[in-house]
Amino acid sequence: MKKIVGLLIIAFSGVLNAQINPNPGYWQQQADYKMELSMDVKTFQYKGTQVLEYTNNSNDTLKKVFYHLFPNAFQPGSEMDIRLQTITDPDKRMIKTFKVEDKEVKESRISNLKPDQIGYLKISNFKQEGTLATIKVVGTILEVTLVKPLLPKSKTTFTLDFDGQVPEQIRRSGRNSSEGVALSMTQWYPKICEFDFEGWHADPYIGREFHGVWGNYDVKITIDKTYTLGATGYLQNKNEIGHGYQEEGVEVKHPKKTKTLTWHFVAPMVHDFAWGADNNFLHDKIIGENGVELHFLYKNDPEYIKNWKDMQPKTAELLSFFNKAIGPYPYQQYSVIQGGDGGMEYAMCTLITGKRSLPSLVGVTAHEMAHSWFQHILATNESKHEWM
C-alpha cells in the first residue's frame, strides 16, 4: 500500500510540475549583434563590420555555424533565379512576360541583371575569439568551421567584415522600387541561421518567409545626410539626427560641410533588423496606446499624402485593437515605411507600397501589423510552416 501511495505522489508531483512548467526541456539560442555600416547612395554598395555574441543554450556541441547571405539570391543563375524559370506559377513581380511566335514566355527578372544591378554580400576576415576561421559560401549560405567547438550552455564571439551591393528591387529588398523608394533594406546583413531541436535551418533564400534567432541589435548606419530612415529599434541619437525624430522643441541643424549622418538604432529581443531610406521621405509621428510611438515614412507625393495622413489615426486604432484582442505590444515603437513591392512584416516595422487608396493602406497595414504578434513575438518557422 505504501508503495502505491508513493507512486501516486510521484506521479502527481510530475503532473503538477508539468503544469507549472509545461515544457521544461525547452531552450533557444541567442544572437546579440553589433553592426556598423556605411552606405554609398550613388553605387548602392555598402561596407560594414559585425560583432556577434552567440549563446549556445542547446545540449549539443557545435563544430560549425551557418549564416544567411540573402542578397546573393539576386544574381543570374542563383537558386531563386532557376526556381523562377522552372516553376509553373512564378511570382508576377519577379518575372517579365512576353510573346514569341504567339507563345507566352515568362522570364526571370533576375536572369538579366547586370553586375552593377545584382545583389551580393561578401564576407571576409571571419574570426572566432580573434582567430581566423575557415569559411565556405554556397549560394545564400555561409558555412563556418569553428576554430574551437562551442560547448553546450556556453557563448562565443564572432567578428567579420562584409561588403554588399543592394540589388535592383525585385522582391522585398532592393533599390529604386517601382514607386521610387531608394532603399528597402530588408534581409541585407550576414544573419546567423536558426539552430533548434531540429538542427540547423540553413535554408537557401528563394524569396519566401524567414526564421530567425532572438537577440539584441545595436546598429549604426552612416548615409548621406539628406536621407530619412525608418527602422527596427529605437533611435539613440534623435536630437543629433533630426529628420522628425527629435524631441519637441529641439531644432536640429546640420553644418553645410557635413555630408553624412550616422544613425544609431538599438533593438532589444527581436529576431531581425530592417530599414528603409529615401531622400524624399516625409516623416510623421503620433503616440498610440501605452505610449507607443507610431512612425510613418512615405514619399512626398501630393497625390497620396492625404491618404497617408488619414491612415495614421486608423493605425493607432489597430494597435489598440490588437492589444485587446491578442495581448499588449511589447515594444515602444512601430514604423510603417513605404518600400518594397507589396507588404512584408519585420521587427517593429513593416515595408509596404504606398500608392494606394485609404482602405488599401489601412488594410495592408492591419495585415502586416498583426504579424508583430504572429511572427515577431511567436517567432514561428514560416519557412517550414508557410500557412503560419
Regions found by a protein language model. Give the residues of each.
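Glycine/proline-rich low-complexity spacer/linker segments in large multi-domain proteins
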Residues: 77-92, 163-217
